[in-house]
């Protein structure tokens, strides 16, 4: 989201203020889990020269999913009012994730009489509509939104299947920052992160939770004796992943890196031989293109928007099944026809941000023209 906005602002045709509400929680610290971490988020900050405010909204246990759009809208409403009172007017609300943010954005659009564009990104469409009340709120928001963006065609198809009018949905894929993620000297990168020479190294990047399926990769390792695995991310599955590696006697070949800043991820992408994404759900996984931009091919599960990213031999291979055996088969296929790193980089270069940026600008202009007519 931040990168997409940076490129949009860099076009010189858009300016923006960001209101990014976070749940209210009274105590700070990792021992309080996700909410304790969110409590440390500042009220205001500047990121890449973009002013961002983080008003707090109430999340209620047990009933939280159904009422969160309303508490989020209430918190954002006060902050948007302050922004308007400061003399900064705006033309449209650009919301990311349909639920709860997009639902709240439509409420705010009605209150402030501003058009609303909502971007669907993944679980907001392929998971949350399984719950009756959120599903209805999502459909209501989709009906009332002035424009809808999906980060892949698969999400548009899913929304149409839910009953959303296709004419109001514009697929605009995420791009990749080709300057931030670029090839390095691979031997130097491997040495920098301490990789053993001669070992084929997999990298898995993402939150340590069941949906990301890092465990599936670990379960494949007994069938891959010359392969090591690096996992970058934090989350509730850390202890379970470590335990699984010990049970399978592959603990010496699995290294959990913890949280890795984006500035350092480039080194890991260049050091690895393959990025593996075994997720059960993805809209458009940025890590795939980040890896390819560094010249490293991928092996990925054949879900949602991923086939739209991994669409040529230079990009990598899709797993025939989301199983350890499927991963082993895909890796065997990749290693038998391993692409040149330069070819993988060239493939990624077709996924820069400019087409997406222009697509957003065109969409905003068309919506504002309709409103003015």
Show which residues each predicted segment covers.
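Short alpha-helical donor nucleotide-sugar binding micro-motif in glycosyltransferases
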Residues: 259-260, 267-272
